[in-house]
């Protein structure tokens, strides 16, 4: 769903690897390539999904041995005690070796002062990346400006993370398609009034740092299912159509966040007799 520009960037990365492998097999000169990447974008734009896909592609190309994806963040890498942060980084690196390590909100490692243990985590990470360059791929993810600051936090990061893939926010149309696809998979059909309200809901959401993208579409869908259940439970012997149809009454008003546990709405609906 969406991600056209991201798919193009992923193809560029993987095609380069494939051609370099072909050149090596034919004893042609090859250009050393850093496989580590920076992913920038708001939450819910598919960064983890693409990281998982890349891990599988890297394994199929023989870039990594196992192709597992290990996810972590500052809390998984930094300890509040002297000497423990490096050990935590090494422990996570051990789990990820042979696959891909995804560091979410990696910029948080660089936010403290000179004495912050996040700096120790970055220094250790740079050494791990160098020592395990043939066995580990690292993807650092976060907001664009913050990730720029992260790369600038250590002289060794810019050369090891030369490529950035930007994940744009989903359009209103793409968010509607995500909502509709979730409904199709779960056995729910939005009627025209529900579709119109869902589209209006997405159009009203501010595109700021808190914008949840695909997660927002999922939250709105799950909220609609909860609201529909509260509405349908009041119907005596509901029909299959009533059980599977989402109406405008089941969609949160534009500008209002999704919520669960709503009170059943009064209804005079009855199955056709």
Language model features: what each stretch is:
Residues 4-7, 206-233:
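The conserved phosphate-sensing helix
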